[in-house]
Design a protein with these regions (language model features):
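Serine-esterase "nucleophile elbow" of acetyl-processing enzymes
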Residues: 1-52, 62-69
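Short acidic active-site motifs
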Residues: 58
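Alpha-helical cap/lid subdomain in secreted, periplasmic
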Residues: 61-203
Length: 203
């Protein structure tokens, strides 16, 4: 980033990034940009490549189709929930996630400009509890081991939103009206974890 242009942000993901169940200005990506601006950072509107229901394959195809032009000063990656929900084995998910991580790295000037997020725990939501939650939770734990290891191996930054997502078990106000996705209040919790890491990446 230079002083004569605003920071460019690319957010890659699925429903958790696009903000399914909340207004666009209530999703964590929008909140992050606004918080950075409030703290004096010049930030362009984030480029968001994400949709409800997307798997790694869907995201891969969308990146090809939308062809965002880098470099970006900050790239975020949050993907895997739908692979897990569709019962894709961790061994199959791992190379797909690493491929998406490689793509994220390709849009950034260096690995420390990439922020990888863990996959939120959806098994404690009403929808999650109706779909073999123990089996999904076990698979999701392995998925997040893959996510963390990928971030470590590539030297990216990592934000763990799993603890925040688990708070829905005690506070239903953190769940959107669809009984699955995060409510604005949960996006706020994520922001508190994401913001300092993203701000450091832009330093």
């Amino acid at each position: 980033m230079t002083e004569d242009r605003p920071a460019r942000v690319l957010a890659l993901g699925d429903s958790y990034t696009i903000g399914t169940g909340v207004d666009p200005d209530e999703r964590w990506v929008s909140k992050l940009a606004n918080r950075l601006r409030a703290d004096g950072e010049s930030v362009a509107d984030p480029v968001v490549i994400a949709e409800n229901g997307w798997t790694t394959d869907d995201l891969d195809g969308a990146i090809d189709e939308q062809d965002p032009q880098g470099p970006f000063d900050l790239v975020t990656l949050l993907i895997g929930a739908n692979n897990c929900f569709q019962e894709e084995p961790p061994a199959t998910f791992e190379p797909k996630f690493r491929a998406m991580l490689d793509r994220a790295l390709g849009f950034a000037p260096n690995p420390e400009s990439v922020v990888v997020l863990t996959v939120p725990d959806y098994t404690l939501t009403p929808v999650g509890e109706e779909n073999d939650p123990d089996e999904h939770a076990e698979r999701l734990e392995r998925y997040n081991e893959i996510v963390r290891e990928g971030a470590r191996a590539e030297g990216t930054r990592l934000v763990d939103v799993v603890p925040s997502s688990k708070r829905v078990a005690e506070d239903e106000s953190l769940i959107a009206d669809d009984d699955l996705h995060p409510a604005p209040a949960q996006h706020d919790l994520w922001l508190e974890r994401i913001y300092p890491v993203a701000a450091a990446a832009l330093d």
